[in-house]
Amino acid sequence: MKNLGIGTGRRKTAVARVCIRMGNGNVTVNRRDVGAYFPTAEQLRRVREPLFATANERRYDVIVNVYGGGLDGQAGACAHGIARALVRADASNQASLRAGGLLTRDSRMVERKKYGQRGARRRFQFSKR
């Protein structure tokens, strides 16, 4: 079957490659059902959000290959990739996805640990004497 839209989504260190095809609403992540891959309801809602925002939850089958990061980051990357693929498939989806903030890459990353400190911001305990 022909791919209608292909999109790449990113969140933190997770990267998701997404293909959408005409179908009946099946979402597959790394060859597993989305419900089996993401354990929490919040992660499932996040992944399906672009489909609900464009009222396409029963119109397309979504195939996602995601790697890197943790499950929350991967869920965000999937949502970003699905949103981009939906725009490629049908440009009329762009307005509703942009309004929901689903096409914007979340640029927040983990701040690096600095030398001479315990963490990114936390310092070692200070002793006056």
Swiss-Prot record:
Q: Is the keyword Ribonucleoprotein assigned to this protein?
A: yes
Does the record bear Ribonucleoprotein in its keywords?
Answer: yes
Source organism's superkingdom? Bacteria
Q: Which InterPro entries match?
A: Ribosomal_Su5_D2-typ_SF (IPR020568), Ribosomal_uS9 (IPR000754), Ribosomal_uS9_bac/plastid (IPR023035), Ribosomal_uS9_CS (IPR020574), Ribsml_uS5_D2-typ_fold_subgr (IPR014721)
What GO terms fall under cellular component here? Answer: cytoplasm; small ribosomal subunit
One family name in Pfam for this protein: Ribosomal_S9
Q: Name one GO molecular function term.
A: structural constituent of ribosome
State the Gene Ontology BP annotations: translation
Question: Do you know which SUPFAM superfamilies this protein is assigned to?
Answer: Ribosomal protein S5 domain 2-like
Q: Which UniProt keywords apply?
A: Ribonucleoprotein, Ribosomal protein
Family as reported in the entry's similarity comment: Belongs to the universal ribosomal protein uS9 family.
Protein's recorded name: Small ribosomal subunit protein uS9
Q: What is the lineage of its organism?
A: Bacteria, Pseudomonadati, Spirochaetota, Spirochaetia, Spirochaetales
Q: Its gene?
A: rpsI
